[in-house]
């Protein structure tokens, strides 16, 4: 191995001495070649045919006879140092001119869920067109009244988000300020925070603050009363106690309802006469002393109002009064029936109450305790 290394070293020294003249001419500093402004990977522009020879000399492309394997290996290692200028030039070109990377569209799952993933925002600024599956952010409206507006997209790829006061982002959204107001190089200087998602389901909802006696004065009262029970109007309080329990009514509610009085419905004739004739009771079988005069007065008034011939009715009423006072009960009944039959048919109802009330005990129990339907209809 040592002998082989010595042979290789001597051969390289000989070749180096021969190629010193050509290498000095090629390693001199030359003017940079004019590059085009395109986005091609190896964009050397449009050059003349004479310049391709210069590029070939710079790149170290030389026609050499094929030698042994060791010589070709050593030559390729030496040419790698000469081609460092081209690789550095290409590296500077890629850094100075940032070409937009063509990123792939999101997966089908992201399109269906209509979600703005964090990985997609960090990778690229690819924005799809409006379609049925994917809806753009500016067309989506929040139901609570807050609108989402899409800001200017920076070269870093993060959108500047603005929201209305009714639906705001969490408190740490201030980290997005370098991306909206600064240059892209200033934005990359800080550690980038992941952009907040634009939908309510992904946002972190801050828990409510613990209630204190200052904020809720009812807590102090409840603590003093050793904890008040919940209201009975809420059905979830005593659900465990209500299984199989029937509602019991208080004992006072079982009161006897008023029943129908059948005795009043089957009244006798004496009760009917006691109700229809004032001043006359069923137990008392005699008329009071003033009742005939009162009944005669009512009959006279009815006759004066209803009849057209006043003198005829006055004579009839006077004759009836004389007959009633003079005769007994039997003769009075016969005269009353005769006078009723002698009158016209339209005047039968005039002195009806007088005849009814003038009857004595024989007439009271004449029907045997049954109601006279014809007399009820006449009344």
Swiss-Prot record:
Induction: Following amputation, expressed in regenerating tissues.
Null mutant phenotype: Loss of posterior structures and beta-catenin (ctnnb1)-dependent gene transcription due to the absence of accumulation of beta-catenin (ctnnb1) in the nucleus. Fishes show reduced regenerative outgrowth following amputation due to decreased cell proliferation.
GO cellular component, one term: nucleus
Biased composition (Basic residues): 239-249
Segments for region (Disordered): 206-257, 302-348
Tissue expression: Mainly expressed in proliferating tissues.
Gene Ontology BP annotations: axon extension; fin regeneration; positive regulation of canonical Wnt signaling pathway; protein import into nucleus; Wnt signaling pathway
Ranges annotated as biased composition (Polar residues): 212-236, 326-342
Subcellular location: Nucleus
Keyword Transcription (UniProt): no
Classification via Pfam families: FAM53
Keyword Nucleus: yes
Keywords, sorted A to Z: Nucleus, Wnt signaling pathway
Locus of motif Nuclear localization signal: 246-249
Function: Acts as a regulator of Wnt signaling pathway by regulating beta-catenin (ctnnb1) nuclear localization. Required for appendage regeneration by regulating cell proliferation.
Subunit details: Interacts with ctnnb1.
Similarity remark: Belongs to the FAM53 family.
Designated name of the protein: Protein FAM53B
Organism encoding this protein: Danio rerio
